[in-house]
């Protein structure tokens, strides 16, 4: 029987990097936001977050030209919490492990900055997101009543699950 070597994969998950989000990214970010959310953030929301100093990142493939945004996130650092305000994966990149990689990067940021907890809100109807968050160690902390608007114009609202992950931080090192 002949010996066959495995072919190189046609599709592979490239090396991904986080880069600071800037004004030049907003057209692509807005297209992703509007394609992904029933009630998307506005351009003003993103500009305000960047101006306020929220940690705003775009995830891109290192070797891709032109460099598309694969995902983005907006993080609000506080004393002992890193609040994940917005996380979105490019619709064409979903189901490829990008969200997992972004969550791992967010956890690494929190750990490097000695922030022991990551908080987020998620719609209870967003089963895919909840499954991901639970898979990476988030647990249900609380419920915010009537937090999200529903897709209809009825004025009804959906609760938010508040989820949290407490990190095992390395000991602080002090320089003398």
Regions found by a protein language model. Give the residues of each.
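Positions that flank functional sites
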Residues: 48, 125, 147-148
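Short amphipathic alpha-helical segments
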Residues: 87, 131, 145
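Acidic active-site catalytic centers that drive phospho-/nucleotidyl reactions
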Residues: 25, 126, 159
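Acetyl-CoA-dependent GNAT
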Residues: 2-4, 11-12, 17-94, 100-109, ...
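Short Asp/Glu-rich motifs
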Residues: 52-53, 129, 152-153
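Conserved glycine-rich acetyl-CoA-binding loop
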Residues: 90-104, 112-113, 117-118, 124-131, ...
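Conserved catalytic-core motifs of GNAT/GCN5-like acyltransferases
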Residues: 2, 119-121, 134, 139-162
């Amino acid at each position: 029987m002949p010996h066959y070597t495995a072919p190189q994969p046609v599709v592979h998950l490239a090396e991904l990097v986080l880069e600071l989000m800037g004004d030049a990214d907003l057209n692509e970010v807005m297209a992703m936001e509007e394609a992904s959310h029933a009630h998307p953030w506005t351009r003003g929301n993103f500009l305000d977050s960047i101006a306020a100093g929220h940690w705003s990142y775009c995830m891109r493939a290192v070797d891709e030209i032109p460099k598309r945004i694969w995902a983005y996130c907006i993080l609000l650092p506080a004393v002992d919490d890193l609040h994940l305000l917005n996380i979105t994966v490019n619709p064409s990149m979903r189901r490829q492990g990008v969200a997992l990689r972004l969550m791992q990067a967010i956890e690494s940021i929190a750990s490097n900055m000695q922030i022991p907890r990551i908080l987020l809100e998620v719609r209870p109807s967003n089963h895919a997101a909840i499954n991901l968050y639970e898979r990476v160690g988030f647990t249900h902390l609380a419920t915010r009543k009537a937090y999200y608007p529903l897709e209809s114009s009825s004025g009804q609202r959906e609760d938010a699950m508040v989820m949290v992950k407490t990190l095992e931080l390395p000991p602080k090192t002090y320089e003398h």
